[in-house]
Amino acid sequence: MALEMTQRQGIVVWLYSLRQVKQLRRYGLVYYTSKRMKYVYLYVDADQAPAVIERLKKLHYVKRVTRSQRPMLDMEFGALAELANQETATKAALKE
């Protein structure tokens, strides 16, 4: 029996009040709650994300719902580190 990884999607739910945070648990895993900015970060299955977003938008205590952009970002930073090292080397050479 092999354990399969399910794809997850992060959803940011902006609220009018934080009283309903417990109610959001039925839609997904509440990962983080910001009391100051009044938002909740949820994780849901990627295949269920569009349906969950539509259900969340219909709730009266939800201000807005946005998807996390992290899956769309390129997480390879090796080339950027090399570029930064080259820039610092050229700046050091110019100072001398």
UniProtKB/Swiss-Prot annotation:
Q: Does the keyword Glycoprotein apply?
A: no
- Offer one Pfam family short name for this entry: DUF2129
What GO CC annotations are associated with the protein?
Answer: cytoplasm
Chief localisation class: cytoplasm
- Swiss-Prot/TrEMBL keywords: Cytoplasm
Q: Disulfide bonds, which pairs?
A: none
What is its subcellular localisation? Cytoplasm
Family statement = Belongs to the UPF0298 family.
- What is the name attached to this protein's record? UPF0298 protein LCA_1075
Q: Tell me which species this is from.
A: Latilactobacillus sakei subsp. sakei (strain 23K)
